[in-house]
Amino acid sequence: CGKKNEDKSLSDLAYYRQFPYVNQELAYLYQAADFVISLAGANVIYEILALKKPNILIPLPKKASRGDQILNAESFSSQGFSVVLPQEELEENPAVLPDCLEKLHENKEKYIKAMEASRERDGRRNVLAVIQSVLDGKS
C-alpha cells in the first residue's frame, strides 16, 4: 500500500493484510497465495508466470503510463495466463472484481496448465535459441 497509505478501516479484515513495502517477504507471500491480483509490470507478470499463480492483472491505464502494462496484460490474457480487469472498468464498477475472482477460480486449472506449457518459462531453451541464431548468422 506504500508508506503512510495504510487504510485503517481494513485492518480488522480476516485474510487480508496491508504492507507498506514488501522486500524479502515477497517469496513467502507468493508461496502462501492461492492467486495474485496485481498491476501488469514486466517483473511481476514474469514472477507470476514462473510461479504459475492464477492471477488477475489490473494494468495501469494509458493516461498513467506508457501503455506497456496494457500490452503486457493483453499478451498474458491472449496466452491464457491471466484474467485482465482494466482499471477504468474497476473504478467505474467495483462489483466486477468478485466476478473476475469467480472466473479465475472456475478456470484455475486452465490458467495453470497454460502457464506450465509456456515456452517463456524455459529460460535455458530461450537463451540457447538466441545463441544458436547468433552462431547461425555468423556461419
Predicted regions located by residue number:
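Donor-nucleotide binding loops and adjacent catalytic segments primarily
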Residues: 1-36, 70-72, 85-94
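C-terminal alpha-helical cap of glycosyltransferases
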Residues: 103-105, 120-139
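Short hydrophobic beta-strand element within catalytic cores of glycosyltransferases
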Residues: 38, 54-66
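Short alpha-helix at the nucleotide-sugar/activated-sugar donor binding site of glycosyltransferases
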Residues: 30, 48-49, 56, 77
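Acidic donor-binding loop of glycosyltransferase active sites
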Residues: 31-46, 53
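A short, well-ordered alpha-helix in the C-terminal region of glycosyltransferases
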Residues: 107-121
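Conserved sugar-transfer catalytic core signal across GT-A, GT-B, and GT-C glycosyltransferases
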Residues: 25, 43-47, 51, 72
